[in-house]
Amino acid sequence: MCIRDSYEEFAGKDIHITEYNTSYIPNAPVHDTCYNAAYVAHMLSRLGDCHTSYSYWTFGDVFEELGVPFTPFHGGFGLVANGCIPKPTFWTFAFYKKLTGTCIHRSEDSLITKQKDGSYYGVIWNPDNDGKGEKKEVTYTIHLPENYERQEYCNLVKIVDEEHGNPLKVWHDLGEPANPSKDEVSLMREVAKPWIT
């Protein structure tokens, strides 16, 4: 039950969460990070049951209030950096888009749904909440049906972390060019994709 349903005048009405982000300032370095992606994954895991939609502020780093950024990564609000480079949080939303069907598992660090066709989709996140930068390993075991040997299945894993799907790291490794070359932008776009195992 949603809180809104306890108020007769609001019961059953749509709730839309609009223009939210992890910080209210347009140049917060956290916006460009994997930590932001994990934080948003956790936040989305708590929003979906009673809300019709949610709208992250904003899709791209280039918008009228501040103009074109001076560097590709500057802590802008967007899911996509200047140069059409997807940030890690972009993938959080791409992964969540697949979570249709029935929620069968929700915890502090994961969400799994079962689709109508019998397949499963899940999102697992692992933020560094202690602020010390220490790695915390998250391990999941997938239990297959007893007769899985006679069935076809595929376990596809897409990873975004500090080493994969993280164009900010590559930009740092390139020396943080304010105006990256065409080849550097292409490289950052390529490494912005999740690692698939």
Stretches with model-predicted labels:
Residues 17-135:
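Aromatic/acidic polysaccharide-binding cleft in carbohydrate-active enzymes
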Residues 125-197:
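C-terminal beta-sandwich/jelly-roll accessory domains of carbohydrate-active enzymes
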Residues 7-11, 147-149:
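Short helix-capping segments at alpha-helix termini
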Residues 6-7, 47:
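Broad structural signal for hydrophobic residues in well-ordered alpha-helices, predominantly aliphatic
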Residues 13-15, 155:
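Residue-level recognition of the N-termini of beta-strands and the immediately preceding loop/turn
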Residues 10-13, 24:
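Acidic/histidine-rich catalytic cores of soluble enzymes
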Residues 1-5:
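Conserved small/polar residues in nucleotide/adenosyl-binding loops
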